[in-house]
């Protein structure tokens, strides 16, 4: 061996290895699935590269994975004749984890073994799963197209470091030898290995072969070795749906996603006609750990005429459906397709539209057939789905049907109410869908803006996530009915309160001088001062006009570091509230000012959750409490 050196693992690799050995031990047989899956990927990459450089096959185009074991040496060897690796690639792939956010992810792992195994599985362990059953792993590899003396040797005990060196290797591809720990002898058994491969890797399009030694009947002659194929070795998506079991669909999902959990639902679809393609789409049962990371890769596996082209082809799914996993096999795209060609291509656009509709139909069917399962989906991916109305105007109505909200109809923060349910419960004469946005469910639920609606028995949607205000800027109507924020000043809301119009007008006339005094006092700090009959228990509220930026939108701008225009509120006073009546009767201008400022601060605090000068508010409150006692 030449160029031998010992290198230290990246700290995240050391941490992952320790976590994996302890957390995944109960499901240790998955090491074989992961290593065979990697070998399959290596074959896919070679096929793709060989489209433009055929000599990479090195006169050996029959791609396969081979498995052998040695009971005496207590070793299992998995070898492939795929793309192989250079020395630099070995260091990058086996010594480091390139995923952004890995450190934060590993820090989130706790002491709950069952939960940890799910999280680590979701992260995708790949090659490192070899250490679940091994106390030493040896790798011999050579990249396709490299010379025989450019082979690479890698070995580690899965602790702090690894050894790497240059070797000669006749054949291209990768050979991984696992030196089993004590107590792992169950895997030194032909039947056991066959059963694991059948369970996890039957769907792999690559032949998986196991070594069979045939005893020679003649004395002095050596035993012969043959290789027996033990999987179907046919791409799963090319088979008829009726031939595929649910277990095979689930295992294929785990193969392409490297997720350990079963998918929630899936759809296998073959289209013939103007465009010919096969798609296999999966909705995961849990969100990927790095879904909100901007560097998170997403998209479908792309095949053209059954030849693997690329992973993470994001051009076939809109961003709000980035959690959808699966593949598309197109007969219409060229074999030499690149990401750049996909970007501006009518075939791609048509496929994207069709696949988007298919994914939305899957979710719509789930919502109708199994509300409990759909709720599980919503808890994991609801926030992402809320990006849909802004991103996909074509499918806005279909997306809107899939949205779920908390509402005044249910005394719960759970987002379970659909817009169709809301519309079905609308009161007689109601022509709008009412909603409120706030910083929290409690703030929305207890907002004074809801008082009139509770009195009238009108349901209001309670929106309390940061994305909600932005979403409602695009979600303007549903089923022919406009959305209306209850925190906006609007004539239609005033009309709702017009029960005793003559009596209300009389009160307003009597309090005209009071309203003028308040206007004079506050000046241009507020847009308008008026009396309102929308309130029952609250003395005053502030509102914004329909065409102006809302409080929640202003908060979003501020959180994003953008300049926020001044929001001027309408100050609306409840003439039936005792505090307003008391304020109207105060003749002393200083005391009157304190009362009005206090009422305004209360309204602003209820609306924004903060005050510009909380100390002044406390001082006024204390003064009034003391004067009341005197």
UniProtKB/Swiss-Prot annotation:
Localization per Swiss-Prot or TrEMBL: Cytoplasm
Pfam families: HATPase_c_3 (PF13589), HSP90 (PF00183)
InterPro entries reported for this sequence: HATPase_C_sf, Heat_shock_protein_90_CS, HSP90_C, Hsp90_fam, Hsp90_N, Ribosomal_Su5_D2-typ_SF
Keywords, sorted A to Z: ATP-binding, Chaperone, Cytoplasm, Nucleotide-binding, Stress response
Region described as A: spans on this chain: 1-339
Superkingdom in the source lineage: Bacteria
Annotated GO CC locations: cytoplasm
SMART domains: HATPase_c
Region (C): 556-630
Principal location: cytoplasm
Region annotation B: where it falls in the sequence: 340-555
GO molecular function, one term: ATP hydrolysis activity
Entry annotated with the keyword Phosphoprotein: no
Entry function: Molecular chaperone. Has ATPase activity.
Subunit annotation: Homodimer.
Similarity section: Belongs to the heat shock protein 90 family.
Name under which the protein is recorded: Chaperone protein HtpG
Native source species: Photorhabdus laumondii subsp. laumondii (strain DSM 15139 / CIP 105565 / TT01) (Photorhabdus luminescens subsp. laumondii)
Lineage: Bacteria, Pseudomonadati, Pseudomonadota, Gammaproteobacteria, Enterobacterales
Name of the encoding gene: htpG
């Amino acid at each position: 061996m030449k160029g031998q050196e010992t290198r230290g693992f990246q700290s995240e690799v050391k941490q992952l290895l320790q976590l994996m050995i302890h957390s995944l031990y109960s499901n240790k047989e998955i090491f074989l699935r992961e290593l065979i899956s990697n070998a399959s990927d290596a074959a896919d990459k070679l096929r793709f590269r060989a489209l433009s450089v055929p000599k990479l096959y090195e006169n050996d185009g029959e791609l396969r994975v081979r498995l052998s074991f040695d009971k005496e040496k207590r070793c299992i060897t998995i070898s492939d004749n795929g793309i192989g690796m250079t020395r630099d690639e070995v260091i990058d792939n086996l010594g480091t984890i390139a995923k952004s956010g890995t450190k934060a992810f590993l820090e989130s792992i706790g002491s709950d073994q069952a939960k940890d195994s799910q999280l680590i599985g979701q992260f995708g362990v790949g090659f490192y799963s070899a250490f679940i059953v091994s106390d030493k792993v040896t790798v011999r590899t050579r990249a396709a197209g490299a010379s025989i003396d450019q082979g690479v040797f890698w070995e580690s005990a899965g602790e702090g470091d690894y050894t790497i060196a240059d070797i000669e290797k006749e054949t291209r591809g990768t050979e991984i030898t696992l030196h089993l720990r004590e107590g792992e002898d169950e895997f030194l058994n032909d039947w056991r290995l066959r059963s694991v491969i059948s369970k996890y890797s039957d769907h792999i399009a690559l032949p998986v072969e196991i070594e069979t030694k045939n005893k020679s009947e003649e004395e002095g002659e050596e035993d012969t070795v043959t290789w027996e194929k033990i999987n179907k070795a046919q791409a799963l998506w090319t088979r008829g749906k009726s031939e595929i079991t649910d277990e095979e669909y689930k295992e294929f999902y785990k193969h392409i996603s490297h997720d350990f959990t079963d998918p929630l639902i899936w759809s296998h679809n073959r289209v013939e006609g103007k465009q010919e393609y096969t798609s296999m789409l999966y909705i995961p049962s849990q969100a990927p750990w790095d879904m909100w990371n901007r560097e998170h890769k997403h998209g479908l596996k792309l095949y053209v005429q059954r030849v693997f082209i690329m992973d993470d082809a994001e051009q076939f799914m809109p961003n709000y459906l980035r959690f959808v996993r699966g593949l598309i096999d197109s007969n219409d795209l060229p074999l030499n397709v690149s990401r750049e060609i996909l970007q501006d291509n009518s075939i791609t656009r048509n496929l994207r539209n069709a696949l988007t509709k298919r994914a939305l139909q899957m979710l719509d069917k789930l919502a109708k057939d199994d509300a409990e399962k759909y709720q599980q989906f919503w808890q994991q991916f609801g926030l992402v789905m809320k990006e849909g109305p802004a991103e996909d105007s074509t499918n806005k109505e279909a997306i809107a049907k899939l949205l779920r909200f908390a509402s005044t109809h249910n005394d719960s923060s759970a987002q379970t109410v659909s817009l169709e349910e809301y519309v079905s419960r609308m009161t007689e004469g109601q022509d709008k869908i009412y909603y409120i946005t706030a910083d929290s469910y409690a703030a929305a639920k207890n907002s004074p803006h809801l008082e009139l609606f509770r009195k009238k028995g009108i349901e209001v949607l309670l929106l309390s996530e940061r994305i909600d205000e932005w979403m409602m800027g695009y979600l303007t109507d549903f089923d022919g009915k406009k959305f209306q924020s209850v925190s906006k000043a609007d004539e239609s809301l005033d009309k709702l309160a017009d029960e005793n119009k003559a009596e209300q007008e009389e009160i307003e006339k009597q309090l005209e001088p009071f309203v003028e005094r308040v206007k004079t006092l506050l000046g241009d700090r507020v847009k308008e001062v008026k009396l309102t009959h929308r309130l029952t228990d609250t003395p005053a509220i502030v509102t914004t006009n329909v065409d102006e930026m809302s409080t929640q939108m202003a908060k979003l701008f501020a959180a994003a570091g953008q300049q926020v225009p001044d929001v001027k509120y309408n100050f609306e006073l409840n003439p039936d509230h005792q505090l307003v009546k008391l304020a109207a009767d105060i003749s002393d201008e200083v005391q009157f000012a304190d009362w009005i400022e206090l009422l305004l601060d209360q309204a602003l605090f209820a609306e924004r959750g903060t005050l510009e000068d909380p100390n002044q508010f406390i001082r006024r409150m204390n003064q009034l409490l003391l004067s009341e006692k005197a």
